[in-house]
Amino acid sequence: KGKAGELEFARLCRSNGFDAVRRTAQYCGKTGNASDCVGLPGIHIEVKRVERLSIDDALNQSRRDAEAAHDGSLPIVAHRRNHTRWKITMMQ
């Protein structure tokens, strides 16, 4: 569900006026610690479209990847289960 979730989240962002949001792997190729989606400056986006999620593990992954990018971006996790709305969780 990774690719499908990333595409779905990017479409949601664009439909809400964030026109620059794209799936990283589709837009510029997936590189190690890259955000799952790009186009929200200063935010490192980890997308999880799963039924069972450890939010702490996902936040830690986003934090590690954001720190490795050395750009000062804020780590967030965009997540949802089937038949639910998207949620955003961030760690500061």
Predicted regions span which residues?
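Catalytic phosphate/metal-binding cores of nucleic-acid and nucleotide-processing enzymes, i.e., regions
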Residues: 1-92
